[in-house]
Structures are given as structure tokens and as C-alpha cells.
């Protein structure tokens, strides 16, 4: 859980930094990819173990595509109950559904449920953090078969930016011993999201 929190903190800090600097979109994503590789290269934060860590050079990514950065309509769902998020292990973290994002991508009308971790929201560093676990038609082919994750910030208005170029694999893709959230059926996207982190030969 500690390493996962560090990864989330990196992603939040990264988003804040890029908002302060005038980077091109491609530079923004390249910096995100670089920092994610740094995270995986650091023995203190990497989910990789043993030989996998020693052999690690960099994560593979889809080509950067602005098409996969979408501005979605955002509906808050304030009356949703707290629930135990199913995971791949014994851990059952508490979440609420914070809202629903609706958008068009690859000529399809799609939607994603967005969640808030009840423990993290009590920490000032993560108070505005939102989480999307999702599946798409690349699972088991070019991406991890158990889905990918996105981290976002609570928006101020009724839209939210979802950038699939920042989609990443759960730690379970790289090592045993983690309890990773399982994307709900509602977040199965009926399209191929050819963006974000690839999954080949464990890296």
C-alpha cells in the first residue's frame, strides 16, 4: 500500500507541476512517462522484484495520441454508499462512487464510473484524488489482461479531463503479493484504448 500511495502522490504532483509549466502536449506526456520509469527504476518504490528489477530498462508505451485525451461530461453521484472494492487479494479498500464520466471516443458513446478512496481522502495530500479502474478491448493482447488504472483530480465544474495516455498497469502486472482493484463491469469499454502503458514480457 505504501508504494501504491507513493505512485499516486507522484501522479498528483506531476499533474500539478505540468500545469505550472508551458509544455507542449507531447512534452507533457513524455515527462509523465519519464517520471513513471524513474518510479519503477527506484528499488524503494518499484513493484518489480529480483531478476525483473535488475533487467528493467523502461516501460513500453503506446505512441502518444491526443485523440485519447477526452473532455467528458461529469455527473457527481453524492448519495452513493461506501463499499468494499473487490481486489485480486485479501485487501478490500473502502471506496465510494464519486461520479460518472460520459464521453465519445472512437465514434462510440462511452462512460466510466469514477471512485474515491475513503482512506486516502482523509489525507490532505490525496484529498482531491479520484480513481478509475477500467478494461478495454486491448486487455490480454497489448495491455494487462486484468485492466489498467487512471488517477485524476476532482474537477471544479461539470466536465473532467480523462487522458488515457496516462493509463498505467496495476502492480499485480509485475509482481505477486499485491491486492489490486478489479475494474467493475460498468467500466468495461467497448473499444480499444491504444494509449498509455503497454504490457509485454512483464514490462
Describe the residue ranges of each PLM region.
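Bacterial Sec-dependent N-terminal signal peptides
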Residues: 1-24
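Start-of-domain marker
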Residues: 20-79
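Short acidic/polar mixed-charge low-complexity motifs
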Residues: 66, 106-110, 158
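A mature extracytoplasmic/lumenal domain signature
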Residues: 74, 114-118, 136-138, 164-168, ...
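Mid-length scaffold segments of soluble, non-membrane domains
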Residues: 78-145
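Short, surface-exposed linear segments at secondary-structure transitions and domain or protein termini
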Residues: 119-127, 152-160, 201
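Acidic, glycine-rich flexible loop segments
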Residues: 131-168
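Extended, aromatic/histidine-rich regions of cofactor-dependent oxidoreductases associated
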Residues: 168-203
Amino acid at each position: 500500500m505504501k508504494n501504491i500511495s507513493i505512485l499516486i502522490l507522484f501522479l498528483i504532483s506531476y499533474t500539478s507541476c505540468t500545469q505550472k509549466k508551458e509544455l507542449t502536449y507531447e512534452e507533457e506526456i513524455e515527462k509523465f512517462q519519464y517520471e513513471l520509469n524513474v518510479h519503477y527504476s527506484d528499488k524503494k518504490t518499484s513493484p518489480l522484484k529480483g531478476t525483473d528489477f535488475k533487467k528493467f530498462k523502461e516501460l513500453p508505451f503506446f505512441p502518444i495520441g491526443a485523440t485519447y485525451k477526452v473532455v467528458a461530461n461529469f455527473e457527481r453521484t453524492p448519495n452513493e454508499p461506501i463499499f468494499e472494492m473487490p481486489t485480486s487479494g485479501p485487501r478490500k479498500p473502502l471506496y465510494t462512487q464519486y461520479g460518472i464520466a460520459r464521453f465519445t471516443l472512437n465514434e462510440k458513446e462511452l462512460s466510466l464510473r469514477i471512485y474515491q478512496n475513503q482512506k486516502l481522502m482523509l489525507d490532505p495530500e490525496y484529498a482531491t484524488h479520484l480513481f478509475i479502474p477500467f478494461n478495454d478491448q486491448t486487455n490480454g493482447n497489448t495491455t494487462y489482461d486484468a485492466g489498467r488504472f487512471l488517477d485524476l483530480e476532482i474537477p471544479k465544474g461539470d466536465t473532467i479531463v480523462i487522458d488515457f495516455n496516462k493509463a498505467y498497469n496495476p502492480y499485480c502486472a509485475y509482481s505477486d503479493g499485491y491486492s489490486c482493484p478489479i475494474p467493475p463491469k460498468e467500466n468495461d469499454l467497448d473499444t480499444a484504448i491504444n494509449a498509455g502503458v503497454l504490457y509485454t514480457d512483464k514490462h
